[in-house]
Amino acid sequence: MLIIHGTVHTMDGPAIDNGFVAIREGKIWKVGPMEECPADWKGETLDARGGHILPGFVDAHCHLGMFGDAMGFEGDDGNEATDPCTPHLRAIDGVNPMDRCFRDARLAGVTTVLTGPGSANPISGQFVAMKTAGRWLDDMVIKAPAAMKLALGENPKLTYHERHEGPITRMATAAVIRENLAKAVEYRDKLERAAADPDEEKPEFDAKLEALLPVVRRELPVHIHAHRADDIATGIRICKEFGLEYVIVHGTEGHLIANELAREGARVITGPCLGDRSKPELANMSLETPVLLAMAGVKIAICTDHPETPVQYLPLCAAMAVKGGLPADAALAAITIWAAEIGGVAHRVGSLTTGKDGDVVVMSGHPLNWLSRVSAVVVDGRRVTE
């Protein structure tokens, strides 16, 4: 496919005012100004007609396909609220790719999502990075697992308080995480000793600890649900204790500790910003959080947390960050290349770079202008819009 005559936002360099994007065998083949456009192109050609051409949007944190749209309990598969520690739960076993919200995502230009379990459990389970086009989930997966979800703050407290079980305090929530990480470290060490010495007894198989092995081996990052500043600090404290790779998710009060987060080298997926202050830990929610974090030197992404904010409003969330002071280029990066980098999938998506997946969005105007319309969406070199 050849897409021509548009302002090309490559996200790996400056925009090209009148450019083209060529896709071959599902991958980005060539990008440049129209003067360099292949003259002998034989395949499908799409004229952007002076619009904007950019990589497919990436939602770095949502629950797409985990909470079925308008399905009630039958479609509610995001929280296994029967056990505070469920690292062995895999999003790929819960996502419904037939959920109509996948279509909503595609039509809005959101071509990649990181989706997975909610935040009822301190250790919630495994996220998946996947495309929004397709019917057979295994064919849509980019990376599984993509992250291990941890949760701090009000959600685990409320979940288990209502069940008259623990944890019901922030201390207990942190203790659940620490205890199971410590068990995983011990399990890892026993496996390594058994592998090195035939006389050492191999530990009995444990599905939960097996799932945590990539975490304590620094092969899989943890995504920490945390809104309040003290919960953010607790999450980082635990990760430093166990030497984990981590990303803060939501970080609602991150702007209050922006310099400290920069000092710690934290990465933050901010949002959702389109909603009310529905619980106490959202009291300091602000549209300025992304810009204040970015100004401090924190790498950010912007998410919808679908269904909290419908996934199709990801570009609007980025536009609202611009309203809060974030430069437009940074806001666009936060839903493309930065989101892909934080999500560990930048080798495949997030920019119009030669060799990456042919995921492209064509819009009638600037992508952060809410009046701009999506003209076409291409995933893996195939047009997926009607």
Regions found by a protein language model. Give the residues of each.
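Polyanionic/metal-chelating signatures
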Residues: 101, 106-246
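His/Asp/Glu-enriched, well-ordered alpha-helical/loop segment
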Residues: 69-70, 76-81, 86-88, 221, ...
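Histidine-rich, glycine-flanked metal-binding segment
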Residues: 8, 12-54
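Active-site gating loops and adjacent loop-to-helix segments of metal-dependent hydrolytic enzymes
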Residues: 68-95, 133-136, 149-163, 201-202, ...
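C-terminal cap of metal-dependent C-N hydrolases
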Residues: 6-10, 341, 353-386
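Divalent metal-coordination and catalytic microenvironments
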Residues: 6, 21, 26, 50, ...
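A general structural motif
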Residues: 203-205, 224-228, 249-252, 278-287
